A protein has these predicted regions:
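Membrane-lumen/periplasm interface segments of specific transmembrane helices
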Residues: 10-11, 33-104, 117-128, 183-195
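Membrane-embedded, lumen/periplasm-facing catalytic core of multi-pass transferases
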Residues: 139, 173-246
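Perimembrane helix-loop-helix junctions
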Residues: 6-43, 100-110, 154
């Protein structure tokens, strides 16, 4: 995914948590600029087969295959992307709340990661939910965040490590909560596979209607709401009107 190029920010901002360190990092980049040119050449080398393919079949070096699909950076759907019943990241993957809590702890325990991960995640959230189809089609939860779970494992692990230093009952309670979240996540995934969570049309009513059931119950499908995809491609998010004959 081309938008993942923002990972470069993580490496640039690693161990940068004050202005002095930022100055030092900028100076370092300029001093070692030839290193970064080498990295760029290596990057382009990996992409060379794709460039050749594009030129051969489209006569274009860079071919945009999404045609009329685009980002709407002036209208990011951040709230819905994080919390909505349709495809809220933190609703369907609540385990990541632990990582977000851990990001606060980074500023006190692991400063070298603090700014790098925060800036990266904020920018990633903004870019991901600026895409016209912020729910990203047929999938369980927000699949676009899967690429970032390795990075988010750092603040997650920090939370567990800090809790391990507390009283045993607190640590055991925390581990138990993590276990419950894992079970919940797998339960929700099974619901998705069995059909009681729709891949894109889930509403609050539909979510709770069949919450305790793996398979959709009677009346479930009447509670779904399909986005108007044509309008969404224009940056307007409304519900597609149902045909009264159906």
């Amino acid at each position: 995914r081309p938008s993942n190029i923002i990972i470069l920010l993580f490496f640039f901002l690693y161990n940068v948590y004050n202005f002095k360190l930022l100055q030092e990092k900028v100076i370092f980049v300029f001093k070692k600029f030839h290193w970064f040119l080498g990295m760029l050449l290596a990057f382009l080398l990996v992409w060379t087969p794709q460039f050749i393919y594009n030129l051969h079949f489209t006569d274009q070096l860079l071919f945009y295959s999404y045609t009329n699909e685009k980002f709407f950076f002036n209208n990011p759907q951040i709230w819905d992307g994080l919390f909505s019943y349709r495809k809220g990241w933190l609703l369907y993957t609540p385990m990541m709340v632990v990582s977000i809590i851990g990001m606060v702890l980074l500023f006190f325990r692991k400063k070298e990661f603090s700014v790098a991960i925060l800036v990266f995640l904020v920018l990633a959230v903004y870019i991901i939910f600026s895409w016209w189809c912020w729910w990203y089609g047929g999938s369980f939860g927000q699949r676009s965040f899967v690429d970032y779970y390795g990075m988010l494992a750092i603040p997650f692990a920090l939370v567990i490590a800090e809790l391990a230093k507390t009283k045993k009952w607190i640590y055991k309670l925390a581990v138990g909560l993590v276990f419950v979240l894992i079970v919940f996540n797998n339960f929700m995934l099974q619901k998705y596979l069995k059909g009681s969570i729709h891949f894109a049309d889930t509403t609050k009513a539909a979510y709770w209607h069949s919450f305790w059931h793996l398979r959709p119950q009677s009346g479930f499908f009447e509670l779904l709401e399909t986005p108007d995809y044509a309008k969404a491609k224009e940056g307007t998010y409304v519900i597609k009107q149902k045909n009264p004959e159906n």
